Amino acid sequence: MKTLLSFLLVVSSALAAPPSAKEILESVRLRQAQQELNLQGLIREGATIVPFRLTQTGPLIRYSFTKPDEALQLRLGDNDSRLEEVTREGVEKVTPAQFDHKVRGTAVTYEDLALKFLYWPNARVTGENSISLRNCWKLELKAPNRQSQYSNVWLWVDKEGGALMKLEGYDWNGKLAKRFTVVSGQKIEDRWFLKEMRIEEFDPATGKQRARTYLEIKK
């Protein structure tokens, strides 16, 4: 009887075990790559408003801007992502040296759009939290090299839908550099999608907020 009880406890513990960080990140990438979208959006920072069009066909996501005409497109692969600049001259890959470039002068950088952290191999699940009333897995991701402006990223992933609910990026001195938080969501074609995200940029030296930006998506 004691042996049977011990066995049942082991089985119960195994069944209750959370998914690994690798499994969670794979599900996030899969979810991201399965969407078909054609939406309007804007980046709002103080008096600055940057409208854009968001289109997606499977693993290809494009952010299109005007005045001047320009686009950034993201290709989500199985093992890596590729961010590209699209201009009248053609298509050019965004290099790590350009990761800190700001999108139209806002706090959003090229690296933020590239989603490279979703492919970092050094990742672990550290616990669970509730973000905007959603139950989330909390993950710690460590950069594989210094090509990133972030040494590590804390990520909160919705347990039910695999959506990214919150992200904190830390610089190479371990100081908080940027925080992304989903403020609200919306249903588009029976799927949950981002409606508004708050992006906070911090001064690593003082810890004070340097900029607050909002990214909004409209149906």
Task: Give residue spans per PLM region.
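N-terminal, post-signal-peptide region of Sec/Tat-exported proteins
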Residues: 41-77
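Extended lipid/amphipathic-ligand handling interfaces
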Residues: 28, 53-56, 182-187
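Gly/Pro-enriched, hydrophobic low-complexity segments
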Residues: 134-219
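Sec-dependent N-terminal signal peptides
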Residues: 3-13
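A generic structural motif
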Residues: 42-46, 64-66, 84-88, 142-144, ...
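One face of beta-strands
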Residues: 37-41, 52, 61-63, 151-153, ...
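Flexible, processing/modification-adjacent segments and terminal tails
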Residues: 17-26, 30-36, 78-151, 171-174
